Structures are given as structure tokens and as C-alpha cells.
Amino acid sequence: MDVTDKFYQKSIAKLEKGATINELYELLSKYERMENYDACAGIHKAIKDKSN
């Protein structure tokens, strides 16, 4: 499992436990500032999948 998949799974789990999309956007922003773009890709994919 690569970094993107790992963060995708973690993000989906957070949403299922009651986290909001907005909380994931905050997390996305944090990883973007850290320039961890693989993590960003996973979080963004989870947001996109759950927003539809």
C-alpha cells in the first residue's frame, strides 16, 4: 500500500467515525503546507468520493 492509499483509507475511516468534510479540508491544508502531496492526494480522493 502506498502513501496515497494509506491516507485515503485513514480519511475514509475518519469520515465514517463522524469527521466532517471540512475537518478533512483542514487536514488537507496541513499536509499541503508540509508539501506532502501524496498524503494530499489520498485525502482529496476521500473527500471527492464522499462528496458525491
Question: Over which residues does each language-model region extend?
Answer:
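Alpha-helical solenoid scaffolds that mediate protein-protein interactions
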Residues: L27, I47-K48
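Long, non-catalytic architectural segments outside compact domain cores
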Residues: M1-E23, N52
